[in-house]
Design a protein with these regions (language model features):
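Conserved ABC transporter NBD signature motif
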Residues: 8-15, 176-178
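Q-loop/switch helix immediately C-terminal to the Walker
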Residues: 44-56
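H-loop/switch region of ABC-family ATPase nucleotide-binding domains
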Residues: 153-154
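Helical segment within the ABC ATPase nucleotide-binding domain
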Residues: 131-144
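ABC ATPase NBD coupling module
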Residues: 16-30, 60-67, 184-189
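Catalytic Walker B motif of ABC-type/P-loop ATPase nucleotide-binding domains
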Residues: 117-120
Length: 211
């Protein structure tokens, strides 16, 4: 959903987007949601989903078929994921596992390079092994495309391991902000202690203990 701004401004790549309607702000963003079913069209083929994502910022016409050039591009992209999807381009997305769908959604969200990639607990619905694979793919896609990304997570181990800056929030306010070597050297126990010190309460979400 969209939360109204009651103070300050939102700037993306130097442009003030605070007052823009949601559909215009969306042009700056790539998004992967928590629910693996959300980011793809289940009844469409893998290559059709990718084509929709690739054409979202271009001029729309009557052409619909996936071209040979597009198909080769998608095959190359999917091969790099090591999930076997490159050989299933004409398969319906609804036949994929949750992890495969999240990986596909991630590729779709970055086909047209966004100014900002938003990852909204995008591994929370996955089992630990699949979540680790999707996070590995996430790191790869972000690095290769040199993207700016914000990953929301309750998993403190993942927050420490991934990204170059960690911001801890409570009740809508920043209570801890760390980056660089200090972030790399953190442990989950350190973060739990920081939360208790700065929020004045104990952390109650068991998902933060994972890892």
């Amino acid at each position: 959903g969209v939360w109204p701004v009651d103070s300050g401004r939102i700037c993306i790549d130097g442009k003030d987007v605070t007052a823009l309607p949601e559909y215009k702000r969306a042009a700056y963003l790539g998004r992967v949601f928590q629910d693996p079913m959300t980011g793809t069209a289940a009844n469409m083929q893998i290559e059709e989903n990718l084509a929709l994502a690739a054409r979202r910022s271009g001029k729309r016409g009557l052409r619909w078929e996936v071209t040979k050039e597009e198909r080769e591009k998608y095959k190359k992209l999917l091969t790099s994921l090591n999930l076997g999807l490159e050989d299933r381009l004409t398969a319906k997305v609804g036949l994929l596992s949750g992890g495969q769908r999240q990986a596909l959604t991630l590729v779709m969200a970055t086909l047209v390079k966004p100014k900002l990639l938003l990852l909204d607990e995008h591994t929370a619905a996955l089992d630990p092994k699949t979540a680790a694979k999707v996070l590995e793919i996430t790191d790869k896609v972000i690095a290769e495309n040199r993207l700016t990304a914000i990953m929301v997570t309750h998993n403190m181990a993942d927050a420490i391991k991934h990204g170059n800056r960690l911001i801890m929030m409570n009740n809508g306010k920043i209570i801890f902000d760390v980056s660089g070597e200090e972030k790399k050297n953190l442990t989950v126990d350190d973060l739990l202690r920081k939360f208790s010190e700065n929020a004045g309460e104990s952390f109650s979400d068991d998902r933060a203990m994972l890892g």
